[in-house]
Amino acid sequence: MKSKKNVLTHFNDKNTRVLIRALLVGFFALDRQAQAQSILAPGPQPPTETPPAMQQANEMDVFATVPQTEAEPLKWGPLTLRPHPYYQFLDADGLQSGTNNSVHSVIQTISAGVLLQVGSHWALDYSPLWLFYSNREFSNTFGQTASLMGGTSYKDWALGLSQSYSDTSSPTAATASQTRTTSYATALNGSYAMNSKMSLDLTLNQQFESADQFSSYNEWSTLDWLNYQFWPRFSASLGMGGGYVNESSSPDITFQQFQGRILWRASDKISLQLAGGVEVLQFLSGGAAPLVNPIFGATIQYQPFEQTRFSVTGSRTVSSSYLQNQVTENTGVTADLNQRLLGKLFLDLSGGYQLVKYVSSVNTSSSSRQDDLYTFNAQLSRAFLKRGTIAVLYQLSEDNSSQAGYSFTSHQVGFQISYTY
């Protein structure tokens, strides 16, 4: 008979695969978080924080790579430290410091992040962020992000926990100004293998969002799936869930979701992940009628050659807004091409479109705002000293808003240097 300690800390292959599915396809919960829509080019991306015990390959990920097995220079017993310093320089125009006011600025971002792995089941990441603006219409800021991820298994159950925190400030499209936002997110995942074909995915989520001088909210939700594995690399699921949103200065909301999901690895080179259904929202005050919306999330990955990767992602969600008495209907599509050149250079090209419709959560006759956002990103990078990366980048962002003062066009060029142990 196994001891309780061994049962709780040992990952067999079946439970590891179940937990990985629950963690890595969790984005099919169709994120309802308010979208800050930062105008700036993407900043530091922390290294993968998935604990080693859960780093089995995701069979739906065509782009999965074999984990590195290099010696760990900063390892003491069960503790492994992975610093990931980062620097970015941007020369940007079209940055909104207020409605009808787009300006130019040089932005420098410095981060001294560190990832701590505790044993094989827990990973904790912390990244302080310093942003310096040459234009005095913006404030230099200190921000920070942190995340914790862990998991274990017990008999036919695989259990996971994730916690994240962010406190950042940047020019955003939604507010047409530099806006400080704070976010706390907690997720509890449980997956149960009923038999060789059927399984359950259970999730509880808590999200606290706030924005200085704008609306804030707290949300609690669940989305649960019944999965059936028809054959290897193909499964289908039915899901349902719901939640409650407590708004600081807008009507509170209840909502329900009903979805279907398909995961299909058609070949070693292509995969399809698709989820969709309907969401119903009720406003608990203000007199607005309930909203019934189609929602979906989809990703196609295609790798025709070892050095070429192509993906397309689309989604439609409904989320709370930082603007008072508003929710947003968000529909978007993004395509990304990653190409290795001459064996050492990596070219990444991506473009996207997002339609954001602001819907009143109170009974009013005023017209609603609509934003059409277009983005294009180009980045050429090269590795150095095995663990370092240097890249030059360009970003074009354009927002055509139906509300006066919120439209802009921004061009950004720069470079970034990162190093990950």
Across the structure, where does each feature detected by a protein language model lie?
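Cleavable N-terminal export/targeting peptides
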Residues: 1-60
